[in-house]
């Protein structure tokens, strides 16, 4: 692809199952772009062997790690038979392209697919804060790879040119508190409006009295997020877009 992408996101911030499901969160790593990358994986016992399961990639907030979201999703994932994975960003204070994605996220998902029976048309993104922003960008870069995205407390910059990269209008839901000091309603509504103008169907939920703290309301947010995500899947097998980040 001949796009010249000079985007550095410095943010606020298997045919049969070869690995057994477990009720333990496992910390593991892969090598991606010649770098060792850590992640936290939870494949609950409720995931039936040989039955394709959905996968949610959880992108943590700035200053945290993948475990911070996996811990909050674990019980719900067990109830709904969802495999979840929380990768660590290279720099804990931010997510950035190209070091953290899309290639790293693609490598991570494909690695999990090689060990578990994942439904390739039901691979989703969920992000909080800095991770929410990154999830929105990944939805644009890899619109034919990720089926749908939920962002909690995140927004794009106004009139973001990367919106034009999307070959598919990824279903997106955004949750934001009416008292979030980092993401004012005006900014989040602007993201919704910019995406809507380009043909995206964006669901925006403004949570009355809620601030930026996802962790205190995680069970409610997670359930609402899954209610949105599970309605969507790719209409055909995923296609991964390769970018030349050096031009």
Per-region residue spans from a language model:
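Serine-hydrolase catalytic machinery in alpha/beta-hydrolase-like enzymes
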Residues: 25-46, 50-121
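Primarily recognizes the serine-hydrolase "nucleophile elbow" in alpha/beta-hydrolase
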Residues: 69, 114-115, 121-168
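Histidine-bearing beta->alpha loop at or near hydrolase active sites
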Residues: 92, 207-214
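Short beta-strand/loop motif that positions the catalytic acidic residue
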Residues: 174-176, 180
């Amino acid at each position: 692809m001949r796009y010249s992408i000079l985007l550095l996101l410095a943010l606020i911030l298997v045919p049969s199952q070869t690995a057994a499901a477990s009720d333990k969160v496992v910390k593991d790593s892969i090598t991606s772009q010649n770098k060792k990358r850590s992640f936290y994986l939870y494949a609950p016992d409720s995931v039936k062997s040989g039955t394709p399961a959905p996968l949610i990639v959880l992108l943590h907030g700035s200053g945290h790690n993948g475990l911070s979201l996996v811990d909050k999703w674990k019980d719900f994932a067990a109830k709904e038979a969802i495999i979840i994975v929380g990768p660590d960003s290279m720099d804990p204070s931010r997510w950035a392209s190209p070091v953290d994605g899309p290639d790293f996220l693609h490598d991570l998902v494909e690695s999990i697919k090689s060990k578990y029976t994942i439904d390739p048309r039901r691979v989703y993104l969920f992000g909080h804060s800095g991770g929410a922003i990154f999830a929105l960008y990944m939805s644009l870069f890899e619109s034919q790879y990720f089926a749908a995205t939920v962002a909690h407390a995140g927004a794009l910059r106004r009139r973001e040119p990367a919106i034009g990269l999307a070959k598919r209008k990824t279903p997106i839901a955004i949750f934001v508190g009416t008292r979030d000091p980092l993401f004012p309603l005006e900014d989040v509504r602007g993201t919704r409006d910019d995406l809507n103008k380009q043909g995206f169907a964006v669901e925006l939920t403004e949570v009355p009295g809620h601030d930026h703290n996802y962790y205190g309301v995680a069970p409610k947010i997670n359930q609402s997020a899954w209610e949105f995500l599970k309605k969507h899947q790719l209409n055909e097998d995923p296609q991964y877009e390769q970018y030349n980040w050096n031009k």
